[in-house]
From Swiss-Prot:
Residues 128-285 form the CRAL-TRIO domain. PANTHER family: BNIP - RELATED, PROTEIN PRUNE HOMOLOG 2. Residues 1-24, 287-316 are annotated as: Disordered. It comes from Xenopus tropicalis (Western clawed frog). The keyword S-adenosyl-L-methionine does not apply. Keywords: Apoptosis, Cytoplasm. This is Protein prune homolog 2.
Length: 316
């Protein structure tokens, strides 16, 4: 007679872990070989001769190696551009010229540092090189070292230049700094206004700036400001500048219509007169109109000048 077993007794025990693979994993225990880490050449050491390859094992068959022709190559997209890039870089290096010591000294001479009004200024000497004749030393007058400073307006730059303001700014610094170097004691300025077209005439702002930047010593030592061949335009400019200039300076202004009249006031031995002004003076004397003093390209304005002089006389 069979004895029935309880269902709970024949039921398998629940697993302690989940078998996700459906099969049990068998652990294998590996045993590490004994390695001698000593630095001697004893048996089992990593420096032992037993671990070194024999010459036969080190024999390499060169024929079995892949040569560059047989090996697989990778196409480089920029490979074709590499020579052109190298040539461009080479051209850039070739375009850079060596900067000699003489060129370096010449470059330093292109800039001049001056002190005007207790402020340090730099003058671009290269840009004003064509206009340096605008101011020159005309020798001395009287006793001592009373200098004659000649200012030729015909050498001023044309206002149509794109960099006109930049040129005039540097030229202004050059004129003021040169004036300070030329003047030791009393001096006079001879302003050659003839043969100067309107487009070369300095503006009112530039003349005002010159006057304001002149050192007090230079203003005081200025004894006379002679304007040769005055035109209606320059007379008008000076009339407009009266509000910001002193009455003492206005009294120093003199108008001279010819070079002959100028020679009666100052010694002309060292005064350089440009050829264009000499020619203009001859034309004015031949036309017997020295009083007008107008430029060849300007209309006669005797009537307007007379009215202007009458008004100025009434104001005085």
């Amino acid at each position: 007679m069979d004895i029935p077993l309880d269902a709970a007794e024949i039921r398998p025990e629940p697993p302690n872990s989940l078998d996700l693979n459906g099969s049990s994993t068998r652990k294998i225990k590996l045993t590490a070989p004994n390695i001698n880490l000593s630095l001697d050449h004893s048996e089992g050491s990593i420096l032992s001769d037993d671990n070194l390859d024999t010459p036969d094992e080190l024999d390499i068959n060169v024929d079995d190696l892949d040569t560059p022709d047989e090996a697989d190559s990778f196409d480089y997209t920029g490979q074709d551009d590499q020579p052109a890039l190298g040539e461009a870089v080479q051209e850039d290096f070739e375009s850079i010229q060596e900067y000699t010591a003489e060129e370096e000294r010449a470059d330093n001479r292109l800039w001049r540092t001056v002190v005007i009004g207790e402020q340090e200024q730099r003058i671009d000497m290269k840009v004003i090189e064509p206009y340096k004749k605008v101011i020159s030393h005309g020798g001395y007058y009287g006793e001592g070292v009373n200098a004659i400073i000649v200012f030729a307006a015909c050498f001023l730059p044309d206002s149509s230049r794109p960099d006109y303001n930049y040129v005039m700014e540097n030229l202004f610094l050059y004129v003021i700094s040169t004036l300070e170097l030329m003047v030791a004691e009393d001096y006079m300025v001879v302003y050659l206004n003839g043969a100067t077209p309107r487009r070369k005439m300095p503006g009112l702002g530039w003349m005002k700036k010159c006057y304001q930047m002149i050192d007090r010593r230079l203003r005081k030592n200025l004894k006379s400001f002679i304007i040769v061949h005055p035109s209606w335009f320059i007379r008008t400019i000076l009339a407009l500048t009266r509000p910001f200039i002193s009455s003492k300076f206005s009294s120093k202004i003199k108008y001279v219509s010819t070079l002959a009249e100028l020679s009666e006031l100052i010694p002309m031995e060292y005064v350089h007169i440009p050829e264009t002004i000499v020619k203009l003076d001859e034309e004015l004397r031949e036309s017997e109109s020295p009083k007008a003093g107008c430029l060849p390209n300007e209309p006669e304005m005797n009537t307007l000048e007379e009215e202007f002089e009458n008004k100025m006389g009434d104001n005085d």
